[in-house]
């Protein structure tokens, strides 16, 4: 009953807004009840996904006029469960030239990052003369990243820049991180993404096949080593990651 009361209130609230602003649109990142109410009163809705999209129940997925997602897999998925919605990919530019740089996208909690793994991968790329940049999660409040940046004399990217902006401005050859849309965006930009997730990390909830679309530092280290030895394999590696 509390949900019904909330829904009724939202419908009344949105109806009042529509009377004042007939062409009003609602942009949100997952407000299902709001979406249902908006559709009922005839207000256009736009769902802007932030993060990897979760699988949904077709039975209770609300009607949305527009859905914006990061990957072609997500686009196909939502076109299937919501055929009357206009599903769009966020526009991303593929880079034609890359530089000898690496961006590491960090998680929001120190406890989810292994200092040992970070040190291992930093040492590896620094020995190969790559310039490495760290990108903090927008909500990060820990101390590990500053400690690592100081230890290895690394630059931390301006927190105002999002993942795509960082990739476009630095043009790295590799991006590194844990389960994140940053690595999905990286592949679309034409930059090889490397995952630091443990092999048993569960991504079954996600539409995007994250493990298939990244090189695993834990499971494909030798392949990464070979790629660094022979960068002529780069284009082939990108192509394989996009379809495997």
Q: Model-found features: residue ranges?
A:
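Conserved acidic residues
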Residues: 23-25, 65, 101, 171-174
């Amino acid at each position: 009953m509390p949900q019904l009361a909330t829904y009724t209130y939202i419908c009344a609230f949105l109806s009042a807004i529509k009377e004042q602003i007939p062409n009003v649109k609602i942009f949100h990142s997952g407000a299902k009840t709001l979406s249902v109410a908006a559709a009922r009163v005839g207000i256009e809705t736009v769902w802007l996904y932030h993060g990897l999209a979760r699988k949904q129940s077709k039975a209770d997925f609300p009607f949305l006029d527009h859905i914006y997602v990061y990957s072609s897999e997500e686009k196909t998925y939502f076109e299937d469960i919501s055929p009357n919605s206009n599903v769009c990919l966020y526009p991303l530019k593929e880079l034609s030239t890359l530089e000898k740089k690496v961006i590491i996208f960090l998680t929001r909690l120190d406890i989810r990052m292994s200092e040992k793994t970070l040190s291992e991968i930093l040492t590896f790329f620094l020995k190969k003369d790559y310039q490495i940049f760290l990108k903090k999660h927008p909500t990060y409040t820990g101390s590990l990243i500053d400690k690592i940046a100081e230890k290895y004399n690394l630059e931390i990217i301006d927190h105002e820049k999002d993942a795509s902006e960082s990739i476009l401005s630095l043009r790295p050859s590799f991006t590194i991180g844990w389960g994140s849309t940053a690595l999905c965006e990286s592949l679309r930009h034409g930059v090889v993404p490397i995952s630091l997730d443990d092999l048993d990390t569960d991504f079954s909830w996600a539409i995007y096949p994250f493990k298939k679309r990244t090189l695993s530092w834990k499971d494909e280290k030798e392949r990464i080593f070979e790629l660094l030895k022979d960068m002529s394999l780069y284009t082939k590696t990108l192509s394989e990651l996009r379809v495997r």
